[in-house]
């Protein structure tokens, strides 16, 4: 057996929830969590893996509550997209401080703040070893950041969408509420739909399924889990066609 194992993936799309950046704060960005995540991404870059990142915005803004209170959903979603840009700026800065070359691309033009999203340029940057952070979701309201992660993953021809969450995989029930919940190591797209498991919203999930994009759900708050995932070790839950 080789003493220097090769990564299981060459190019990945890492989806982080905005909540993952909060740490124990309850709101905003925990600098310690941000720096740890930047270090974990740096490890992947040093392994020669090409990394695209999509971050949610739920730590800074959640449109659902305001929509229920009467705010126009489109306005709420635009605010949510801007929250993902703020998280993207924080992540880019953390990567730069960790001496990792990173570019931030936004689906909404924000001249002087970050680059506009450009598919060909994103792939060129990934090939040159830069981390590319995709912000502002898909640029459209009514689309989640999970949809953005699957869309960007498909566009950049990533081999997998890694969904970093607060639990270490997909369970038969909510493990926070039900101690009897069983963790799955592998699932097919069909099994997820049949069992009505909550992996991501249906639009995002069916997009991944239709384009045969594997999804791997793991706990981003567990130190070393991201590296284990990309090295093909047993970590999290893999969802694919067969």
UniProtKB/Swiss-Prot annotation:
Oligomer status and interactors: Homohexamer.
Pfam entry (one): AA_kinase
Residues that hold UMP according to the record: 57, 77, 138-145
Chain positions recorded as ATP binding sites: 15-18, 58, 62, 165, 171, 174
Reactions catalysed, as given in the entry: UMP + ATP = UDP + ADP
Keywords: Allosteric enzyme, ATP-binding, Cytoplasm, Kinase, Nucleotide-binding, Pyrimidine biosynthesis, Transferase
The enzyme's E.C. designation: 2.7.4.22
GO MF terms held by the record: ATP binding; UMP kinase activity
InterPro entries hit by this protein: AceGlu_kinase-like_sf (IPR036393), Asp/Glu/Uridylate_kinase (IPR001048), Uridylate_kinase (IPR011817), Uridylate_kinase_bac (IPR015963)
Major localization listed first in the record, in broad terms: cytoplasm
Protein name: Uridylate kinase
Region annotation (Involved in allosteric activation by GTP) ranges: 23-28
Source organism (scientific name): Shewanella oneidensis (strain ATCC 700550 / JCM 31522 / CIP 106686 / LMG 19005 / NCIMB 14063 / MR-1)
Pathway named in the protein's UniProt entry: Pyrimidine metabolism; CTP biosynthesis via de novo pathway; UDP from UMP (UMPK route): step 1/1
